[in-house]
């Protein structure tokens, strides 16, 4: 067994492994639960201690004052706006008054030039003025004595109505209006309803089997709404012709869009095909046993031993009606149905039956075949038999016959019932009429077959010839698939005027590169074999596929042009994002939008070489030198970084190392050749967009996790001591290096002092001077540290103030100078030590470079440009101070957490120190 190389394991060992996995999984789950419970317990304890709510009273007052100032500013803005509106209204009214006065002055300009004495008032009336006033006064009380109608109204006779009754009345009116609207809507729907079981108060379902009308009504049910949709499409088409409007607009009004209507039509066709498939399985099993010579089952090539077994019992079991009963039932049902139909319905039904090929024909489910249908073998035999039994019927009424069984072809046709002579004369028109075919078995096998009667053998041979002729005319359209869905789709394809709506062209499938390569291989193979016709066809197909791919890359596909435009407009409305990139100095500029490139995307293509020399003289180095102006080159140089140059260098060196081993081909030649190769026009823009998206995501994640941003919920409020307009003063959230260790932090997210605005930098200097005066009053010296190491991480700017004893503070410049000179790389590209005694950090260090700076009180200090960010420690300044004060390395190497009570004591003590020097209260 070992020689076979098989490794066997006992069930016990397998069970032990499973058990160990279960235990490990259980331990992990229990550990995760414990950690979660501990974290929740810690949060609850912090909440009970008041860590999330407690803060200094001065800080609380300051926050309230800031809120009041903000609200006062908003009120002032609102009042100012309101006052402005009032002024504008007054100005408008004054203008209108002045215009009116001007008009009146213009009209009475002549009268103003002369003074005319007014006639005396007594001339108008002989009565004195005082008498007129008295009369007016006397008339006023007479008018007041007349009472209004409501005063004389008897309120006790009025009908009292409560609020509940009024509400009930309103609700009743609303329900009545709703019922009226619903009734009107149902009337409209019933007028358009094509389902006969919904009309005249129907339930939508067919009646029981005992009802006579159930047989005919089955023609309009179980089709999934297909007939209704086709009729609706016909009406929409007629409406478009009548109103001279576009068909797409009318379809969009009713169904939303043509695509939605087509989707519903396809779903209805699938449902109808499934229903017809299920129904035909039961119907075609039924046969009729009036004459044994007409009832025999097929003989299969694989089951020849079963042919001798009688099948009379099977036939008798499915036989339900005799020939005469079936014909009488059909005539009585049709006559009663015809009498019940209204006049316009009867006329429309006759018109539809007279011209089925022109009008829309809903998919009728095939009813149970009668005895004469089962006895028929072809169209001619059916007519002769029917004339013997039932006499001559109306020739305009179509009939559906059960299909014939034939080794070569099985077909049954729907034709008008006419004489055999007329059938021969109209044989040339049979190919234009719809054919319904029953699928045959594979390789000529038939699942059922009927033996034709002796007196119809000659007619059957003639019909077979006619069927073969019609089959040749149909050509490749005839298919024999075994499912009902293919049968229905074939019948729809063969109709001369399909009721299917005029669909928009289906979206063409774009060939992939692999498929196009296979197509090219077929072209080569056809050319080698000498089949030039096939090669030309395949070549045209390949060219068309390439054009479609180019159209898709350009976004101008004619198939989905309208849909793509709508989707793009929706996307532009919903997701409009401005991508920006930030350079070393903190300036941001927008990234160019994506341009529609004419070059196809995907696949590996050889990059074309650009001519770099003309007459043995170099005219360009890079492929885009002709498109770059001096302004563009300066812009790219200022906005680019050293990382961009390194990435470009790596891209040029990555995929061109295969030729370096050849003679006379050096590394310089490789870069020169690589630079001269033409790149895709949109590659650089795509690269910039991806870089901008990456920067935006990283900045968003950094700002969400930042514990120093004033708007962040995780900011430790209990450590804040003072709040200014642009910066705030707080204590560290860990064990302090010395007593009085504090931080000056901007309110907003800023990364370095070299990128600060003027007002923020000035306020930091104000806090710095106040802290120096505070520590001087305590007999201490102080050192200010700032580390801007990881510029790409965009960390929050923190300006640390660490108090020192006087004797240690005097020696601090010597310690820091020596440490800076020995730090970082031995050979540096920038100056090792930068003196800040004569200029501040903003003028000493270029923007965007990582640096470390130290200031000693109000004096200047030193700065150092960091060469290697990975080798320079983030605790560099604290390490020097810890060495000067002989502190434990754990204090400055890794932040040591403190209890809330210790932090609160520390904050209260520092607040007492800070209170006399608080610059925020001035």
Curated annotation (Swiss-Prot):
Gene3D superfamilies: HIT-like. Residues 1-130, 164-220, 261-513, 540-574 are annotated as: Disordered. Keywords: Coiled coil. Residues 73-95 have a biased composition (Basic residues). Residues 12-106, 165-278, 525-557, 673-706 form a coiled coil. The keyword Iron-sulfur does not apply. Residues 102-116 have a biased composition (Acidic residues). The gene is cwf19l2. Residues 12-52, 167-191, 288-355, 369-384, 410-435, 456-503, 540-553, 560-574 have a biased composition (Basic and acidic residues). Belongs to the CWF19 family. This is CWF19-like protein 2.
